[in-house]
């Protein structure tokens, strides 16, 4: 059973029920909606469709809303595009003008106040580069370092620079409210630079009565990397968003950053998603490149909770095949990882009772050669903490909450399973044995380790470990 989860971006390529159904069967665990594109009406149709499909299949499939985040773009040119050469002088202005070969407007009026001489501006995903040589209250005068064709509304990036624009825009607020109204499970927060960005979103979620949505912080710039500790402590998970990160940070640093973030999240018990260009060639081709296969495998070796498909499923020619391919790579890679050795050699910080019991549960499962760990968890917290230790046995996450059932689909190694309320520990143990045996197809006499709380219906009461034979 595959331990690493798969996040798939929905789009035109998978807007029909048959394709989405096949993607779920192929291994999709989380459906991602990118709110940088499409209308609320488009997203509403896709949310309704994924809910319909997951109900028919009886599968826990979480829904993730990915925000647009702070956006910096140029506006338009008189003729739609221009061509710039190295050492040309070019101006970005806060004034509203029609762009030409010498200047263009920007969408952020405060940009001239945030930049200094010597700062670098990248456009069109880093294909064009500019160095700031001077500025006024409204203009940023630059020297073209790398030229090329520049067309309307291209994105702007500022390596190693944190701008002062307000993090939570009105557009993001509208999108988040829409997501809350349509019962999304996760919000992926774009361009998180510090913990205050997350606190702003939490405050807004509280304002609209949607505090049950989990936050995934997307790390896409230098500030996000530098502040990973405080960001990790404020969110429910991290996305290593390598696309924009590779523009804002020298690309040769990305592999080390990816590994450090994944390790940090594992130590803290946070879910971590590795994203961007994992099987990019499958947008057009039925088979991935050898480098892409190794990229996916390396993320799995690192211990990522999930791997993500973007354009491959949203707009590619082979969305189902892309999911199937990613699942095959992950499954085969996991067979070659010695999880028991990793667990025994890792140094985890045990901070509370849940940590201690979760760690002991994993150790006991190894010691007695158990076939599974069964976690009874209302909120999913205990299941996530057990998952954090990456045990070598399967984890079954039993919950009475449908919301938790879907959310656990993003947790490494956890097979979510709905169960009824249990009036006593005896009934709890009976249900745990019965459901675990059924879900994992265990044999009579196989041992499982059960952990959870004695108090029924309350979160945070994890206080037991028990060994049972099915």
Model segments located where?
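Non-catalytic helical/linker scaffolds that mediate oligomerization, partner binding
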Residues: 1-470
